[in-house]
């Protein structure tokens, strides 16, 4: 059964298992989410739910986004996300979804987030390209190097690794394990590291791979 959740990255810490081994975990505040809309095969051609996350003042939303909440008379939400699920019969508009409703300890999940932005960077930092000599009068240290032949083909090939914007990309880490779910504080402890800065928005889904 497909499961999905929105969350906010809190940070990393470590816990001990029953054998006394240290487990590095990332703490994620998952939900609570509010069901804003239900989509069905009859009306939309597929089954899905649209959820909202983090209440926000009306003045901070655009008119199109506000319109989605005015129809259902729900409080405005900062984030809206649609999840296609196999069975939406258990969800109703206005219903609150908590972390414990979706995931349990031992579940395998995929986590997607936006990586930290690094700005404009050169090829050494962006791709790990080797630097030139630092001594003996060399003027070539962290430069690009050759970008191709001159006369033939006389152009730079597509995909050539060049300086440019680094980071701020959607990254998905697959097959992570849920170590613990704190239902009182809506926290999920996930084994290992996940992308994004502290406070970054995350999409958590049950894994698409078996992990064998």
From Swiss-Prot:
It holds the Pfam family Ribosomal_L3. This is Large ribosomal subunit protein uL3. The gene is rplC. Belongs to the universal ribosomal protein uL3 family. One of the primary rRNA binding proteins, it binds directly near the 3'-end of the 23S rRNA, where it nucleates assembly of the 50S subunit. It comes from the Bacteria. One of its GO terms (molecular function) is rRNA binding. SUPFAM superfamilies: Translation proteins (SSF50447). One of its GO terms (biological process) is translation. GO terms for cellular component: cytosolic large ribosomal subunit. InterPro entries: Ribosomal_uL3 (IPR000597), Ribosomal_uL3_bac/org-type (IPR019927), Ribosomal_uL3_CS (IPR019926), Transl_B-barrel_sf (IPR009000). Keywords: Ribonucleoprotein, Ribosomal protein, RNA-binding, rRNA-binding. Part of the 50S ribosomal subunit. Forms a cluster with proteins L14 and L19. The keyword rRNA-binding applies. HAMAP family: Ribosomal_uL3_B.
